[in-house]
Amino acid sequence: MSLKESFKALSDPTRQEILQMLTKGRMSAGDIGAHFDMTGATVSHHLNTLKQAGLVEDIREGKYIYYELNMSVIEEMMGWFLQLRK
């Protein structure tokens, strides 16, 4: 995963909203999908894009998959922005 992939994943408003939701803690794909008027496949696509970009991680518990923010990648992105101030 690269910063380029992470920034590209952030370009979509739905994915931005998903990340904002995850700031409150981990959520299941079903709980995330309940906030949007789109198919489960579309929500899965957005979650997969965020996962491939390293912005979220998935945790399997039994038959459920939960998603949470990957703070290490977010911190890396913030560090990149802070370097621009120098």
Task: Annotate each predicted stretch with a short phrase.
Residues 51-61, 68:
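Beta-hairpin "wing" of winged helix-turn-helix
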Residues 13, 25-28:
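Short capping segments at the starts of secondary-structure elements
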Residues 16-18:
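Pre-recognition alpha-helix immediately N-terminal to the DNA-recognition helix
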Residues 28, 39-42:
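Helix-turn-helix DNA-binding motif, specifically the short coil turn and the N-cap/start of the second
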Residues 20, 44-48, 63:
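Base-recognition residues in the alpha-helical recognition helix of bacterial helix-turn-helix
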Residues 2-3, 66-86:
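Conserved segment of winged-helix/HTH DNA-binding domains
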Residues 32-33:
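A short acidic, leucine-rich amphipathic alpha-helix
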